[in-house]
Amino acid sequence: MSLENFGNFLTLDEKHSFIKKYFKEFYTKDFKLFTSKDKHYRTRAELSFYHENDTLFYAMFDPKSKKKYIIEYLDFADEKICAFMPKLLEYLRQDDKLKEKLFGVEFLTTKQELSLTLLYHKNIEDIKSNLENLSNNLHINLIARSKGKKLIFKTENLRQTLNIQGREIFYEFNNDCFIQPNTTINEKMITWVCEILSIQKRMDLLELYCGYGNFTLALAQFFFKVLATEISKSSINFALKNCKLNNTTNIHFARLSSEELSLAIKKEREFFRLKDIRLDDFNFSHVLVDPPRAGLDKSVIDLIKKYENIIYISCNPITLKENLKELSLTHRVENFALFDQFVNTPHLECGVFLSKV
């Protein structure tokens, strides 16, 4: 979440100075700072298309003024995206059917692969052969979308390998999954959590908002058992697949919202989706939360504050502070890390480790 409402903080030092003051009621020790390379760090990019004089341009539009900016190069985007952008644009400009009513493009990369999604205001079934030719001629994993329709050429799934403390963790996911869009920072975040856990007394882990298992797979080795929850069915399916890719057998996934999990743990409601999981068999020493920008609601806070240790990954310092007001009644902040996920922008990712008072 942006800090621009508080000032024009762009460098990590500027963000650090602000955060030190902003969270001083909860934490006065040293913050751990994690930097990113300042170019080609972002693995996801979304652009509009602008049509003029029967040709096509990449564009961005200011959300407030609606002013148009023609885009020729994205210095923050992964090198694979930058290399592919001109090839795609040249191909589209030469195919009238492909460029007609084309309004957007999404790029997604991993260390190994690249996928492309084209967005249309027309029935993509009518240009299926053109799309297939594009995929074949440019050797690209292609997804095309229009209202109520989706076509896939080659595959929509991407493979990723993260290096965590000398270990390789293998993942598969697609464009519909929530991903950390800066791979270097993602590896540093996971490693930071692993380093804290390595010196802790540990039993079982409860993880909320687990997605496709980004943290889960790397942290599982530190615990006897892991219960990880997520509401997205496709993300759960990828998480199960990623367990097999890593030969990990101590993780139990449940497709539940955090509110549903709270009801289940308090035995206020039974869920068929938990029929193969006995909650009483878990002894949670740690809970990990990586919530959306809105942060944690009261039911989740009431749930997690029962546990000895909390790891909170936050993309929004504002809601993090609000949540810490509640959590600080039972826990204290032991470690605080700042991750410069989006370099030279007011955005900041935080990691907080809390233990029971």
From Swiss-Prot:
Entries under SUPFAM superfamilies matching the protein: S-adenosyl-L-methionine-dependent methyltransferases
Chemical reaction(s) catalysed: uridine(54) in tRNA + S-adenosyl-L-methionine = 5-methyluridine(54) in tRNA + S-adenosyl-L-homocysteine + H(+); uridine(341) in tmRNA + S-adenosyl-L-methionine = 5-methyluridine(341) in tmRNA + S-adenosyl-L-homocysteine + H(+)
E.C. number(s) listed in UniProt: 2.1.1.-, 2.1.1.35
Keyword list, A-Z: Methyltransferase, S-adenosyl-L-methionine, Transferase, tRNA processing
InterPro entries according to UniProt: MeTrfase_TrmA_AS, SAM-dependent_MTases_sf, TrmA_MeTrfase, U5_MeTrfase_fam
Keyword match Signal: no
Name of the top EC class for this enzyme: transferase
Molecular function terms, GO-annotated: rRNA binding; tRNA (uracil(54)-C5)-methyltransferase activity, S-adenosyl methionine-dependent; tRNA binding
Residues of the active site: C315, E349
UniProt keyword Lipoprotein, yes or no: no
Pfam annotation, one family: tRNA_U5-meth_tr
Lineage: superkingdom: Bacteria
Gene Ontology biological process terms in this record: methylation; tRNA processing
Signal peptide: none
Binding site for S-adenosyl-L-methionine: Q180, Y209, N214, E230, D290
Cellular component annotations (GO), alphabetically ordered: cytosol
Role played: Dual-specificity methyltransferase that catalyzes the formation of 5-methyluridine at position 54 (m5U54) in all tRNAs, and that of position 341 (m5U341) in tmRNA (transfer-mRNA).
Family: Belongs to the class I-like SAM-binding methyltransferase superfamily. RNA M5U methyltransferase family. TrmA subfamily.
Name under which the protein is recorded: tRNA/tmRNA (uracil-C(5))-methyltransferase
Gene: trmA
